[in-house]
Amino acid sequence: MSRELIILCQPILVLFLTLFYNSHGYFVSQGSVGIGFNGYFTLTNTTKHTFGQAFENEHVEIKNSSTGVISSFSVNFFFAIVPEHNQQGSHGMTFVISPTRGLPGASSDQYLGIFNKTNNGKASNNVIAIELDIHKDEEFGDIDDNHVGININGLRSVASASAGYYDDKDGSFKKLSLISREVMRLSIVYSQPDQQLNVTLFPAEIPVPPLKPLLSLNRDLSPYLLEKMYLGFTASTGSVGAIHYLMGWLVNGVIEYPRLELSIPVLPPYPKKTSNRTKTVLAVCLTVSVFAAFVASWIGFVFYLRHKKVKEVLEEWEIQYGPHRFAYKELFNATKGFKEKQLLGKGGFGQVYKGTLPGSDAEIAVKRTSHDSRQGMSEFLAEISTIGRLRHPNLVRLLGYCRHKENLYLVYDYMPNGSLDKYLNRSENQERLTWEQRFRIIKDVATALLHLHQEWVQVIIHRDIKPANVLIDNEMNARLGDFGLAKLYDQGFDPETSKVAGTFGYIAPEFLRTGRATTSTDVYAFGLVMLEVVCGRRIIERRAAENEEYLVDWILELWENGKIFDAAEESIRQEQNRGQVELVLKLGVLCSHQAASIRPAMSVVMRILNGVSQLPDNLLDVVRAEKFREWPETSMELLLLDVNTSSSLELTDSSFVSHGR
C-alpha cells in the first residue's frame, strides 16, 4: 500500500488534467471537483448545496484475506478551506476509506458528500472517514463548528476534538481555524498491533507531526473494512459557500511520520459577487450564447436521432441502487466485441462473457440479458438491489452494470475456475476435488448463506442455490452468485411470493405447493448441494430406460443399512476422512428434509460444520419421518450436543430450526 507524495500544483497541471478527466487515470471524480487557484485541486467551487468526490482509480488491499486483519497504514494530506464569509464556514471535507470507487447516492450539506438520509449510520456501509467539520450539526452530536472527527459508517463521530494541535515544546494546545484560508496538514496513522488510530492536525509549515495526536481511537478497524478498499476525499457546501482545496497527499503501508518541507502558497479570498454592470454585460453575452447553444443543440439532436447507436438514460432506480454504471463502449472493448471466443457460458438467462477492462489488468465477467428474456428487467433490478450492496468474501462481487438498447449487462469479478458443477460433472481426464477442497467449498457456501439470512441488515432469500451458481476463484474458494431470482425483506417480516422460481430438483416441496419462499427453502437446496459435493453425483440420475434414482433416497437407504460412508465418491473415501464425510452426508439429508420445520437454520449448520455442536444420535429416526407433526411431542425434544460445554439445545429451539423464516 505504498504511494509517493502527490503535489497538485501548477507545474504538473497539464499532466493532472489528463489524469483527472480520464476514468482510467489517477482519479475518478463526481460532482463539483475541479481545478482552482494556481492549478490546485478543488473539491468544491462557489456553487451552493453541492458536493465533490475524488477517489483513487485503483483499490488498495488493506486487509489480509486469510487472517481478516487489516495492515498498519499512515496517510498525510495538505488542505485548505476558503469560506465565503470569514466568520462562518460551510460544511467541510473528509478523507474516506470506502468499499466502492465513489459513494453513489451521497448528499451535500450536512452529509458531507459521503452519506444520505437513508444510509447514514448503517453497518453495511463499510466506510471509515476523518471529517474536517466547519458546521455544527446538532442531529449528529457535533461539539462545535470547527472540529476534527473519526466517523465509522455514519456522521455521528465516535471521537472528535476542536481543531488544533499540541506544541512539542511545552505541551500547550494551540487552536487552529479550519476556515482561515491557511494550508494545513492532517496525519492519520493506524497501528494494527496496538489497534490504535491517531489523527493529528497541524500547520503545513511544521515539517513533522507533533508527538501528541489531536485524536486517538483504541479500536480494531478490521471488522469495518473489506479486503479491497478505495481511498478518496469528499467535501460539501450548504447555503454558505466554501472552496475546499486538496494540495497533496502521501499514503504508506507502514507507520511513519514523513518530514515534508514545502513552499506554502497563500490562497486568494473567496470570489466576490459581480457588480450590476458586469451582470448586465454577462446577461447579454449569456442570451447570445444560449441562443447559439440552442441552435447548435437542435442541429446536434437531429444528427443524434439519425446516427444514434448507444442509448444510455439514467433512470430513478439507477440512482437508488447505486453500483457503478459502465459505458457500453467500455464493455464492448473489454470483451473484444462480445466475440464467441470470449463466451464463458449461456442459458435461459442470457450469455456470460469474459473480459479485461481497458487500461488495467482487471478481468471481469459480463452477463448479458434482454428485457424480453426469461430474466428480464425485474430480475435485473433484483440482482442490482441485492448483490450490488453486499460485500462478503464468499459472495461474487458485482462491479457495476450497463444498459444498451434492449440489452442489460451485469459486471462481476471474474472467477477463473468456473462454477462448481464443472467439477461435479467432470470428464474422465479432469482433476478430482480433494476432500479438503470439498469441505472448504461447503463451508464457504454455508458462510455466504448465513450472511444473507441472518447477518445482513435485511433477510435475503437467494431462491436458486445450485452448483452452477457457486463460482470458484483462483484459490479454490467458493463464492455464491447469480442473484437474479433473489428476494429481500426486513428482519422479522414474513415474506409472501406468488411466483415459483428456481431450478427443477432444487425447489423445496412447500415452495411448489404454496409459492412462498423462505430461508428454509434455501436451506433445502443447500442440503442437496452438500450431497452432490460429497457424492460427485447429480441429485437425479437415470439408472434404467425409464427409472430415475434420487440421490437423497439412495443415501438414506445406505444410512439405514449402516453404509452411509459408501455414498461418498470413491476418490475421497479414506478412513481419516470418515468422520467429516459422514457428518456432511447426514447434515445434507437433514437440510434437504421434506418437512421445512425440521431443517436447521444456517447458524446451526455453521456450528455443526465448525465442530461446535453435534448432530443428535437419533437423527436417522428424525429424517425417516415424512412430516414433523407425526412425531410425539416427547420425541421432538431431540438434543443437539454442544462440544465445548457438553450442554444441549432442543431441536425445536429457534437456534436450531429455521422455522421457514
Curated annotation (Swiss-Prot):
Keyword terms, alphabetized: ATP-binding, Cell membrane, Glycoprotein, Kinase, Lectin, Membrane, Nucleotide-binding, Phosphoprotein, Plant defense, Receptor, Serine/threonine-protein kinase, Signal, Transferase, Transmembrane, Transmembrane helix
Catalytic activity: L-seryl-[protein] + ATP = O-phospho-L-seryl-[protein] + ADP + H(+); L-threonyl-[protein] + ATP = O-phospho-L-threonyl-[protein] + ADP + H(+)
Glycosylation sites: N45, N64, N116, N198, N276
MF terms in GO: ATP binding; carbohydrate binding; protein serine kinase activity; protein serine/threonine kinase activity
Catalytic residues (positions): D464 (proton acceptor)
Post-translational modification as stated in the protein's UniProt record: Autophosphorylated on a Ser residue.
Domain Protein kinase: 338-596
Gene Ontology CC: plasma membrane
Tissue: Expressed at low levels in stems, leaves, flowers and siliques.
Enzyme class: transferase
InterPro entries in the cross-refs: ConA-like_dom_sf, Kinase-like_dom_sf, L-type_Lectin-RKs, Legume_lectin_dom, Prot_kinase_dom, Protein_kinase_ATP_BS, Ser/Thr_kinase_AS
Gene null: resulting phenotype: Increased susceptibility to the oomycetes Phytophthora brassicae and Phytophthora capsici but enhanced resistance to the pathogenic bacteria Pseudomonas syringae.
Region spans: Legume-lectin like: 30-250
Residues reported in the UniProt entry to bind ATP: L344, G345, K346, G347, G348, F349, G350, Q351, V352, K367
EC number: 2.7.11.1
UniProt keyword Transferase, yes or no: yes
Topology feature Cytoplasmic, residues: 304-661
Entry function: Confers resistance to the pathogenic oomycetes Phytophthora infestans and Phytophthora capsici, but confers susceptibility to the pathogenic bacteria Pseudomonas syringae.
Family: In the C-terminal section; belongs to the protein kinase superfamily. Ser/Thr protein kinase family. In the N-terminal section; belongs to the leguminous lectin family.
Protein name in the entry: L-type lectin-domain containing receptor kinase V.5
Organism: Arabidopsis thaliana
